[in-house]
From Swiss-Prot:
Keywords: Congenital stationary night blindness, Disease variant, Extracellular matrix, Glycoprotein, Leucine-rich repeat, Proteoglycan, Repeat, Secreted, Sensory transduction, Signal, Vision. It is linked to Night blindness, congenital stationary, 1A: A non-progressive retinal disorder characterized by impaired night vision. Congenital stationary night blindness type 1A is characterized by impaired scotopic vision, myopia, hyperopia, nystagmus and reduced visual acuity. Belongs to the small leucine-rich proteoglycan (SLRP) family. SLRP class IV subfamily. Its main location: secreted. This is Nyctalopin. Gene3D superfamilies: Ribonuclease Inhibitor. LRR repeats lie at residues 60-84, 85-108, 110-133, 134-157, 159-181, 182-204, 205-228, 229-252, 254-276, 277-300, 302-324. InterPro entries: Cys-rich_flank_reg_C, Leu-rich_rpt, Leu-rich_rpt_typical-subtyp, LRR_dom_sf, LRR_TM_domain-containing. Expressed in kidney and retina. Also at low levels in brain, testis and muscle. Within the retina, expressed in the inner segment of photoreceptors, outer and inner nuclear layers and the ganglion cell layer. Residues 336-387 form the LRRCT domain. The keyword NADP does not apply. Residues 1-18 form the signal peptide.
Length: 476
């Protein structure tokens, strides 16, 4: 009897027990599979309009991406004590009830990205998620978030909130003592205030690229002493305070490319001895202060391409010794003696290539590596010549034949022209200066009938003779 009873119990267990060792059946629209320490539930692209009523209580991962979910009520997922990862990306969520994630005490990763209708989050949306380490709110078209939104997430390490509509760094970040990575790129952030990043003492990576940042306030990164990667590229920065990066002694990557900077100040990088990658490309930089890079002894690559630099003095690096690669293309370089040191370094190190010369004229279009600098009698460098194509010929150029003939013909015309009284000449208009010789003769009946035949014959033959004379002179 006992054997039959046990047999009946085993036969009555849900089919999911055999597949995923779960206590409840796998939802009809989902696929469940056994993973380490539980089961994985995949319900992506299932056409769901609501969260399945019953989910396996042993689930460690649930994927509900690309469905039609619009609303999450309180305890929307029931009680799932083992759940560590929940993904709700690419749905139509417009509201999340405070307490929607209660019953998920071990949740470590929550993905809500690409819910473009969400736009608003209640201050207690993430209440009770004390073990959450990764939160993805990217592309939710959020204008702002409550100051206390993340206050109950003491374990949060990584926040992805890019592709939103924030105009300032969310105040909800302040005081997140364990946050290490913050992704805030491609938004509308206009400034990094001195209080924006307060309390982020473990922050190692901050991305603010492709926003509208016009100002970085002094001391803005004062609490970020362990920051290693700072991306401020593709913003609207035209100036930086002298101590903008003070205290960032562990910074390894700094990207300031794609801004509106017109110079590089010496004070900016004074504390960045560990910096390995520095991007200053795609700005309007025309001047680099002496010693601007002198403390960057560990630099592996310096990007200065796409600026307005005409010269780069060695004193920008002294007394440091730069060992990294130098990117200098797309600048209007003036390849005179001020760049001789760079040409020599290019030959010796092989770490610099593509330095196109825009001037002087004799080397324009060449690469700096192709320029040969002359030496004066006392051994000093001599600049390449500045070509002037309009005055470069050593002597007067020969006059074109057509011009010579026309001048000779003009002279003949004057010699053959009839003399007129002074009064009549004074009344001649400027327009008559272009009249032809034949017009003048026919209109005035010059010299009487007895002189016309030889006069006309001379006027016809002499221009031809003049051409032969000029041609003979040119051949000589």
């Amino acid at each position: 009897m006992l054997v039959l009873l046990l047999h009946a119990v085993v036969l009555g267990l849900p089919s999911a027990w055999a597949v995923g060792a779960c206590a409840r059946a796998c939802p009809a629209a989902c696929a469940c599979s056994t993973v380490e320490r539980g089961c994985s539930v995949r319900c992506d692209r299932a056409g769901l309009l609501r969260v399945p009523a019953e989910l396996p209580c042993e689930a460690v991962s649930i994927d509900l991406d690309r469905n039609g979910l619009r609303f999450l009520g309180e305890r929307a997922f029931g009680t799932l004590p083992s759940l560590r990862r929940l993904s709700l990306r690419h749905n139509n969520l417009s509201f999340i009830t405070p307490g929607a994630f209660k019953g998920l005490p071990r949740l470590a990763e929550l993905r809500l990205a690409h819910n473009g209708d969400l736009r608003y989050l209640h201050a207690r949306t993430f209440a009770a998620l004390s073990r959450l380490r990764r939160l993805d709110l990217a592309a939710c078209r959020l204008f702002s978030v409550p100051e206390r939104l993340l206050a109950e997430l003491p374990a949060l390490r990584e926040l992805a909130a890019f592709d939103n509509l924030f105009r300032r760094v969310p105040g909800a970040l302040r005081g997140l003592a364990n946050l290490t990575h913050a992704h805030l790129e491609r938004g509308r952030i206009e400034a990094v205030a001195s209080s924006s990043l307060q309390g982020l003492r473990r922050l190692r990576s901050l991305s603010l690229q492709a926003n509208r940042v016009r100002a970085v306030h002094a001391g803005a990164f004062g609490d970020c002493g362990v920051l290693e990667h700072l991306l401020l590229n593709d913003n609207l920065l035209a100036e930086l305070p002298a101590d903008a990066f003070r205290g960032l002694r562990r910074l390894r990557t700094l990207n300031l490319g794609g801004n509106a900077l017109d110079r590089v100040a010496r004070a900016w990088f004074a504390d960045l001895a560990e910096l390995e990658l520095l991007y200053l490309d795609r700005n309007s930089i025309a001047f680099v202060e002496e010693g601007a890079f002198q403390n960057l002894s560990g630099l592996l690559a310096l990007h200065l391409n796409g600026n307005r630099l005409t010269v780069l003095a060695w004193v920008a690096f002294q007394p440091g010794f730069f060992l990294g690669r130098l990117f200098l293309f797309r600048n209007p370089w003036c390849c005179d003696c001020r760049l001789e040191w760079l040409r020599d370094w290019m030959e010796g190190s092989g770490r610099v290539t593509d330095v196109p010369c825009a001037s002087p004229g004799s080397v324009a279009g060449l690469d700096l590596s192709q320029v040969t600098f002359g030496r004066s009698s006392d051994g000093l460098c001599v600049d390449p010549e500045e070509l002037n194509l309009t005055t470069s010929s050593p002597g007067p150029s020969p006059e074109p034949a057509a011009t010579t003939v026309s001048r000779f013909s003009s002279l003949l015309s004057k010699l053959l022209a009839p003399r007129v009284p002074v009064e009549e000449a004074a009344n001649t208009t400027g327009g008559l200066a272009n009249a032809s010789l034949s017009d003048s003769l026919s209109s005035r009946g010059v010299g009487g009938a007895g002189r016309q035949p030889w006069f006309l014959l001379a006027s016809c033959l002499l221009p031809s003779v003049a051409q032969h004379v000029v041609f003979g002179l040119q051949m000589d």
